[in-house]
Amino acid sequence: MNRELTRRHIECQRSLFFLIFLLLGPSLYAQMAQGKAKFLGNILGNSQPDPDFATYWNQVTPENSGKWASVEPTRGLMEWSGLDAMYQYARSRGFVFKQHNFIWGRQQPSWMDSLPPDQQKLEAKKWISQYGQRYPDTQFIDVVNEPLHNQPSYKKALGGDGSTGWDWVIWAFSTARRYCPHSKLLLNEYNMLAGGKDLEQAITIIKILKRRNLIDGIGVQGHGLENVSDATIRSSLNRLGSLRLPIYISELDLNIADDDSQQKRYKSLFPILWHHSAVKGVTLWGYKQNHIWKSNAYLLRADGSERPALVWLKEYMSH
């Protein structure tokens, strides 16, 4: 018990430092999308202060702090401190905040696997309802993350495939709609911009949710686009746009080690995403060297200097 209390105390101290550091930092910034109709955002890590964030970005997605396993690693013991700090940071700056995520087959609480189905469903409901009570002003929520590729082990408890093939997803969105009535609800999936089977399967789920008025937008992950043709990306965006729902590019990164090659790919790809009429915002998945999921996708070097792609992006967004 003492070890658990000590660990929780340290986590609270780290999160408090994170919040104070960001709130008391310089107040004058010029984010790249400031004053524009669309946001250009990024992720914030767990408890690491990032004084450079507001220099570039005006939308916040928690990288890990909003995942259920991070908030409730032990059943009934909620660790909100990291998420509290990021939510308050976004609100204090006037930045858009997106919760990532409610239901995902990875980084789910390990203790869920030992529960009977009725308890699994109850715990999932509690998780969503507690979030809604604590963060009522959340603008966007990734309700279900990667349903095509990473389904939760407890999906049968939420309705399983059912008559639609995706009843568990319907349950998640219905529950989120009930407890987060002021948030826009998103389905977040990868590989859609590459076209093909994944795109069509995602569209099937989106249509099921749209018929029930349960979905407000489409989260389109931007991983793995280094070698996807521009024509395929345009076609996929148009296909998604035909659903008449806003599109949010949710996890953009270009994992390219060579500076010139990365800049060239940004120059060809980013305008396609940014200027598509259905796309209402773009979120990158990290930007700092050594603090990013894809090791060569960084835009800001460890010494604080900007890679050519970031220099170009700043210039492009200034017009």
Where in this protein do the model-derived segments appear?
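Bacterial N-terminal signal peptides that target proteins for export
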Residues: 3-17
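Bacterial N-terminal signal peptides
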Residues: 15-27
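Boundary/entry segment of secreted carbohydrate-active catalytic domains
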Residues: 31-65
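Acidic-and-aromatic substrate-binding clefts and catalytic sites of carbohydrate-active enzymes
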Residues: 40-52, 68-81, 108, 148-152, ...
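Short, acidic/polar
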Residues: 44-56, 122-131, 197-209, 265-270
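Substrate-binding cleft and catalytic face of glycoside hydrolase catalytic domains
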Residues: 55-73, 82-194, 256
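Aromatic- and acid-rich polysaccharide-binding/catalytic face
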Residues: 57-65, 139, 145, 186-189, ...
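Aromatic-rich peripheral "rim/lid" segments of glycoside hydrolase catalytic domains that contact
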Residues: 72, 110-113, 130, 142-166, ...
